[in-house]
Amino acid sequence: MSDSLRIIFAGTPDFAARHLGALLSSQHKIVGVFTQPDRPAGRGNKLTPSPVKILAEHHGIPVFQPKSLRPEENQHLVADLNADIMVVVAYGLILPAAVLAMPRLGCINVHGSLLPRWRGAAPIQRSVWAGDEKTGITIMQMDIGLDTGAMLHKIECAIQPEDTSATLYDKLAQLGPQGLLITLQQLAAGTALAEVQNETQATYAEKLSKEEAKLDWTLSATQLERCIRAFNPWPVSYFIVDEQPIKVWQAQVLPAGEDAEPGTIIHADKHGIQVATADGVLNITQLQPAGKKAMSAADLLNSRREWFIPGSQLV
């Protein structure tokens, strides 16, 4: 059997486009690309193609953008391509059982965690949020469940104390294509080994929300610092002062000092704005007022010191 596979690629964001790029540089043939419909974006809300569509069209690959793969006429789009396998990376649409069964080798997915931990929509962010020491990439055979399929390949990645979701995203976007190419080689050769997931170890990575990004001072400083890193670059943690949302991009955990109600400003100087929490002190070092660029605590205090008077409360 040839080690060159006929591949349908399904994906939408930049993370997916990096995997498509690796496939385009391989011996495999991309026979079609599925991506989500163009969406309004930018200040003018202009219809904008996904990064995957842009890359596919640049290489002259047929692009399909159905709103759903449930209708039979859309499923025929997959069947007619006569693919050996379908590779799915952050596509954003559910694949019905009929579609999963169409390619000769089925459908495989690149997932941004070490399954079965962090199944679901936001695995990278939740691993930072939870304080995990490691995460990684899992390549799995897709079934009708939510990230429940048998695992074909895993690559681990340490989470550093300073990692944000943005930096971890970049690390996994480099590891994922490596694991994908190895898995495809094994599938083509018939040497791939599938490991069933242990359901007792499964956890779920719920989608992030803007509401969740509001800093809750009744949490510990450690958990708040994790939230700040997990919600970077979106939706970005924030608090309210003078009825204005202030985004927080960087902060440090300090040991507890004087007793104070959570949310109380303990101290504010060029080194940061220190806020009492349920356990420990959060020292905020980089902030972004509404309509402004991100700036150091020192720069914000120069213009808005009245917002951060020691003893006052943040909401």
Curated annotation (Swiss-Prot):
Similarity comment: family membership: Belongs to the Fmt family.
Amino acids binding (6S)-5,6,7,8-tetrahydrofolate: 113-116
One term of GO molecular function: methionyl-tRNA formyltransferase activity
Keyword set, alphabetical order: Protein biosynthesis, Transferase
Role of this protein: Attaches a formyl group to the free amino group of methionyl-tRNA(fMet). The formyl group appears to play a dual role in the initiator identity of N-formylmethionyl-tRNA by promoting its recognition by IF2 and preventing the misappropriation of this tRNA by the elongation apparatus.
Entry GO terms, CC: cytosol
Keyword Cytoplasm: no
Gene, per the UniProt record: fmt
Coiled-coil annotated residue ranges, if any: none
Any Gene Ontology biological process: conversion of methionyl-tRNA to N-formyl-methionyl-tRNA
Protein name: Methionyl-tRNA formyltransferase
EC code: 2.1.2.9
UniProt cross-references to Pfam families, sorted A to Z: Formyl_trans_C, Formyl_trans_N
Annotated catalysed reactions: L-methionyl-tRNA(fMet) + (6R)-10-formyltetrahydrofolate = N-formyl-L-methionyl-tRNA(fMet) + (6S)-5,6,7,8-tetrahydrofolate + H(+)
